[in-house]
Amino acid sequence: GGFRSALDALGGFECVGFCEIDKYAKRAYETLYDTKGERYFEDARNIDPDDLPDIDLICAGFPCQSFSIAGKQRGFDDTRGTLFFEVARIAAAKRPALLFLENVRNLLSHDKGRTFETILEVLDDIGYDVSWMVLNSANFGVPQSRNRVFITGFLRGRCAGEIFAFSQTNPKTLEQRLPGREGNRVYAADGLAITQTSSAGGFAGRTGLYVIPI
């Protein structure tokens, strides 16, 4: 729902459908957003473009596990990694003016850059000019440091423009309020969250405690 949240805040967009294979994530999405009348697709591989209305924008955060440094990095050899091609298939059929894609930063360097080169070639073949940039959520008011690559595709001959003219906006970090062991640390909630030590013991060792104003 990250794309949906941002576009709702921006205004001027109407969501006509969404795709989510995880039943719990789907339930959360439907709790957060009014999806009445929207088309729902469980599996991107089974989407028939003829079931979609004309659309101006496709947003897709295709699965990152296949490209993340935290995983096995099997790339397109992992079924999850091939879901990008489903996005391209639908885009080729529906020809939206814009594509907005997101994934982990390591997508750029995975397989010595060959994976990202394939993505660029596919988007070029279906008629999209592409730009991309790595952005950190910490610079946009989110209390965590999370780098992601954002890719925009502009339908050639129909849409063109520039994007990603961003600057640092939220350099604050969390203040440690109470000293002590990893499991006993308490932080203020007005800055960036620290990365917890997964092997720390004790109460809240893996999550941390935050002072939240009420």
Kindly give the residue locations of the regions a language model identified:
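Short, hydrophobic/glycine-enriched beta-strand segments
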Residues: 2, 57-59
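Glycine-rich, N-terminal phosphate-binding loop of Rossmann-like dinucleotide-binding domains
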Residues: 62
